[in-house]
Amino acid sequence: MVIGILKESGAERRVAMLPGEVAVLIKLGVTVIVEKGAGMLAWASDNDYLAAGASVADRKDLVSGSAFILSVNPPPEDELQIFSEGQTLCSVVNPAENREWLEKARLRGLTVLALDIIPRTTRAQSMDILSSMATVSGYKAVLAAASALPGFFPMFMSAAGTIKPSKVLILGAGVAGLQAVAIARKLGAVVEVFDVRSAVKEEVKSLGGRFIEVDGAKEDSAAGGYAVEQTEEFKLKQQELIQKHARLSDVVIATAQIPGRKAPVLILKETVQAMKSGSVIVDLAACTGGNCE
């Protein structure tokens, strides 16, 4: 079997597979071809891949010589013409947002494996790319907010006086949100967390966060741990609660997403305008429409 690893386009720094994982496949008898410069932004040089046992080629030769092709993001629509019938593409496809791309891939006779719709089950845990990336996103979101904030997360006491700890509001207590809670608390901030799922309340508390909620949220045990669409009445109550807490917060980190749908708008324009001068908003749902209006 021949596996090809594509170089990502644009500002994407990730690569589908690092040299260490390539070496494992090589030992199993798999042939691996890596596109030139694929790992450059992930600090993996072409020589590192060669040392792992892979070969390095340009995109055209890689595609023509591979049966199974890996990438973080799917290749652009205008490049699908270089792929052949019977090939398999494995990527983070976001099927709900990329129906046109999927249709063109189908017409080319390609098999597409969407890593982002693997169910969140114990059996599939080792392939759960969304949770892995969400952990990193939650961590980096707090560090980015702390860097941008013209203040400090922890409380400082000195001869000149006392500086109160920053208040951080986290919207969504999924993997990214819970990671953000943990890091913000470790940095000394006071953390409040909003989520429509009451089941995450104890997890938030165990990390040192204060859980805030609106009564009447709709939940679905079959949703695999994800949030579900709420009623209009609930959304109005939700917006009132979020505005009340956001106005008093120094940092708001938004992580709420619904699989296969546009992210819910939780932070309205008037909420942003009512927030304190110098406060920071980090919207991790921006790629699916954003939680911030």
Which residues make up each language-model segment?
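An N-terminal-biased, well-structured beta-alpha scaffold segment characteristic
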Residues: 1-104, 108
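Glycine/serine-rich phosphate-binding loop and adjoining beta1-alpha1 elements at the start
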Residues: 2, 77-167
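Glycine-rich phosphate/diphosphate-binding loop of Rossmann-like nucleotide-binding domains
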Residues: 6-44, 154-245
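Short, ordered loop/turn segments at secondary-structure junctions
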Residues: 8, 36-39, 61, 74-75, ...
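Generic hydrophobic/aromatic pocket-lining and core-packing "Φ" positions
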Residues: 22, 46, 80, 102, ...
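Hydrophobic beta-strand scaffold residues
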Residues: 32, 56, 89, 111-113, ...
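A structured beta-alpha segment of the ubiquitous adenosine-cofactor-binding alpha/beta core
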Residues: 53-67, 74-75, 222-252, 256-273
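Rossmann-fold NAD(P)-binding glycine/threonine-rich loop
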Residues: 96-122, 261-293
